[in-house]
Amino acid sequence: MKQERTRVVIVGAGPNGMTAAHYMGLYGIDCVVLELADGILPYPRAVGMDDEALRVLQGIGIAELAARDMISNVPLRYYNARGVCFAEVKPSTAHYGWPMRNIFMQQLLEGTLREQLVNYPCVELRQGHEMLELEQDADTVTLLVRDAQGEVYRLQADYVVGADGGRSSVRKQLGIELLGLTHPRKWVVVDTANDTLDAPYTALHADPQRPFVCIYLPYRQRRWEFMLLEGEDEAGMCEETTIRNLIRGHIGDAVDQLQIIRIRAYTHNSRVAARFVQGRVALVGDAAHISPPWAGQGLNSGLRDVANVVWKLAAIIQGRACASIFSSYDQERRGHATDLIALADNMGAVLGLTNPLMAGVRDWLFQAVNSVDNLRSHLLEFKFKPKATITKGLVYHERAQLHEDDLVGQLFVQPDIEDPLGQRRRLDEVLGRSYSILGYRVNPAEYLSEEMTAYWARWETQFIQINRSRSGAGRHQPLSAPGILSIEDVDNRLGEWFSNVRDCIVVVRPDRFVAAITTPERLDGVLRKLAEQLS
């Protein structure tokens, strides 16, 4: 039997698996991606992407390309049985450099990811290859794989990432249980083309007679989702005639122009794997956690998983960090993934009421919320979405008692800045692929001991001094600091961020989470604590 060896194997070539593969390529790590299917499924699946997920794609140079097939700043609206909008989510902020609500079609994103993989000769995508078995010891993971011609071979790797969806073969091979519940009501999902409906938003129609969803998609496509009521026959409800009659009730004869792409009944699950990491194998995306669609966070959670695990893999394989940091992925991601599933459950509960009395109470409550400015803003700006916050893991909290305003462990902001050449850029474009240490109006590199300077140089750490906008002697004489990168805070958003913390130096991880906040005098000691965590 043929035997091969690589550094990382990724099982599954969906958006999560391919994004992880791009990061492996970016870090120069040999990687094989195994995908059972021969090609990309030609219809939409995931359709919502947020600012955090786009920032992950930005890290591999894909965000701008993917955005060409997206509709940005799409509102989310709840309607009652009378067709009156009783709640709206319409964020106007861009804390992380991208719009918060974007509509896309998964097959187009997958196409972009696969097209751009040619930039990384160290990464190989193998379509039509099925993982049959997985075993691991202290040093190696061994996979038994069947190729597209039916030949079986062994593939060994240092690490494996299971990105193979809700029915994950990797998870099953590891014997990891998927904990949670399966929701009793099924939904019929209908993807259509040649759409002419003038409704450029995502509409959740909370009609107790039959809750349904209507999602505006790119390129004249639209998704409809209808709840199956108690006693209804699934097969009969999935017939095209039945579906056209349901849609006709909402758009009239315009339904005759629609092309039906796909009709499928779905059972929604709210489940989380008992472990995200076992030995040298990590589960990401739906392989680790499955969410109902109502918060639009399923794929976004998966991309957060990828961002968390890939830099750790790279650091271990390249000898910068000890292998024990691999397990921190579970510690840092499980809580937030679980919180977002709870959010989806709650949003689905608001939508799915079939008791008219309860639906009336809900409508009244939201009417009351909308009459209070602060509460209405809370809805509009999607402030009720749980923030990813790392309280334990590869971060260092100087305060013994954590506070709500502690920004350590949260995602760092991404405003526009000006580089030394006067070019306006997103912040991440100058942070690099590794750790970054930024000082607000101070040079952080001046406060490191020789030992810490040498240690963080091995990480290719980027040292940056942030200056107020136009604080130099002239347009061609920006303020600079010797030996480090100086940038200008052109929109004063970094100044605003630092005004909310006590200190003027921030340490940012490769995944753009804040590892520590400190003062120049304490910086060397803080970096020593972080180094201890890594090594």
Segments the model singles out, each with a brief description of its role:
Residues 1-7, 11, 27, 83, ...:
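Helical substrate-recognition/capping region of FAD-dependent monooxygenase/halogenase enzymes
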Residues 127-141:
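A conserved short coil-to-beta-strand element within the FAD-binding core of flavoproteins
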Residues 4-6, 150-159:
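Core beta-strand elements of the Rossmann-like FAD/NAD(P) dinucleotide-binding domain
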Residues 237-301, 321-326, 336, 343, ...:
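FAD/FMN-dependent oxidoreductases across multiple families
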Residues 114-115, 138, 159, 163-268:
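Conserved FAD-binding catalytic core of PHBH/FMO-like flavoproteins
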Residues 303-323:
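Internal hydrophobic alpha-helix adjacent to the cofactor/substrate pocket in enzyme cavities
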Residues 6-33:
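N-terminal Rossmann-like FAD-binding beta1-loop-alpha1 element of flavoenzymes
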Residues 42-45, 49-116:
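Active-site-adjacent segment of FAD-dependent monooxygenases/related oxidoreductases
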